[in-house]
């Protein structure tokens, strides 16, 4: 199964949102506020850490450090389509 790869991101630390542009040209808004309640992502409540999100090599996900990451597949599924331009 093909999964769309991440091409570009724009981080909004004040609202815990990330715009993600995928290789098929679709941009999705990822609202991380719900994810921050999960123990795995709890450290991302720190805005300084949240804004350090980086695209993994090959566009297969986002990482913040060696311990916190999320796959492109999950981002695609939880994101909402948007016309916002990155």
What are these regions (language model features)?
Residues 1-86:
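Motif-centric detector for short Cys/His coordination patterns
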């Amino acid at each position: 199964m093909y999964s769309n790869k991440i091409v570009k991101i724009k981080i909004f630390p004040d609202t815990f949102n990330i715009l993600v542009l995928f290789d098929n040209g679709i941009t999705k808004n990822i609202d991380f506020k719900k994810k921050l309640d999960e123990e795995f992502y709890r450290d991302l409540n720190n805005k300084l850490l949240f804004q350090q999100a980086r695209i993994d090599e090959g566009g297969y996900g986002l990482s913040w450090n060696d311990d916190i990451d999320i796959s492109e597949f999950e981002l695609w599924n939880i994101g909402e389509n948007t016309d916002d331009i990155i």
